[in-house]
Amino acid sequence: MVNLREIKGRINSTKSTKQITKAMQMVSSSKLRRAEQNAKAYVPYMEKIQDVVGAIASGTKDSGHPMLTARPVKKTAYLVIGSDRGLAGAYNSSILRQVQRTIDERHKSKDEYVILAIGRVVRDYFVKRDHNVISDVVGLPDQPTFADIKEIARNAVGMFIDGTYDQLYMYYNHFVSAIANEVTEKKLLPLTDLAPPSSNASYEFEPSGEAILEVLLPQYAESLVYGALLDGKASEHASRMTAMKNATDNASDLISDLSLQYNRARQAAITQEITEIVGGAAALE
């Protein structure tokens, strides 16, 4: 016969788990709202700096700046943005799977590429598989500031300028909605596909467009990294909220099934006791 105490223990254990996942769902929901606001608030800045950079670059075609110039590719860098923690559904696995597939398709040797990792899960994945992780940052807050990733962003740009690698791709999860995100690949460097300014505004540059590009181009590339991080953080919180909601729903279903099983077992035990009592009474007559 089914052990009633064991079933009761499983019910209580599942209820405790449900309380935890429900709390995590609510926390992630709160973090998502703020992360989504941060990502949206950053868009106007990105659009404006892109306009300015595009305007300067279109007027200085022969600047020869290394960030604007394509060169023969001997080594490629992949900047991969993930999270420090799990329990976020396919948030990390989907992006890691895509990056790994890309590496397998594009490269025959590990000497042809390097990894820059944002997030402990990303770093540990590539280190465990013996990929060359040349820079990483972990322990980011839920609402990161530019200062949190300034070092790795500047390293990424600086190593391209210095010739450590010849092109840089960035991978992150683009936030679509609270229930959807998509793995996005963006070629970060060289900046060979800068669009002309979207507005008809004209700019006058002092001391010169080339001098301003020298300062603005690294800042622009670094801001793209930060914008992708904000986008990725919104996706992370959304994925974790969805995962915890699914876990909570599954716990509720399991509690219902176990409760039904418990009641049936209890009813069977009572029926058996009555049968034994009746049988014993009949034997005494």
Curated annotation (Swiss-Prot):
Keyword Transport in annotation: yes
Keyword terms of this UniProt record: ATP synthesis, Cell membrane, CF(1), Hydrogen ion transport, Ion transport, Membrane, Transport
Pfam families (alphabetical): ATP-synt (PF00231)
Cellular component, GO, one term: proton-transporting ATP synthase complex
The UniProt record lists the keyword NADP: no
Extent of the signal sequence: none
Annotated InterPro entries: ATP_synth_F1_ATPase_gsu, ATP_synth_F1_gsu, ATP_synth_F1_gsu_CS
Topological relation to the membrane, as annotated: Peripheral membrane protein
Record-linked Gene3D superfamilies: 3.40.1380.10, ATP synthase, gamma subunit, helix hairpin domain
Coarse class of the protein's main subcellular location: membrane
Localization terms from the record: Cell membrane
Function according to Swiss-Prot or TrEMBL: Produces ATP from ADP in the presence of a proton gradient across the membrane. The gamma chain is believed to be important in regulating ATPase activity and the flow of protons through the CF(0) complex.
Subunit note: F-type ATPases have 2 components, CF(1) - the catalytic core - and CF(0) - the membrane proton channel. CF(1) has five subunits: alpha(3), beta(3), gamma(1), delta(1), epsilon(1). CF(0) has three main subunits: a, b and c.
Family membership noted in the UniProt record: Belongs to the ATPase gamma chain family.
Name of the featured protein: ATP synthase gamma chain
Source organism of the structure: Lysinibacillus sphaericus (strain C3-41)
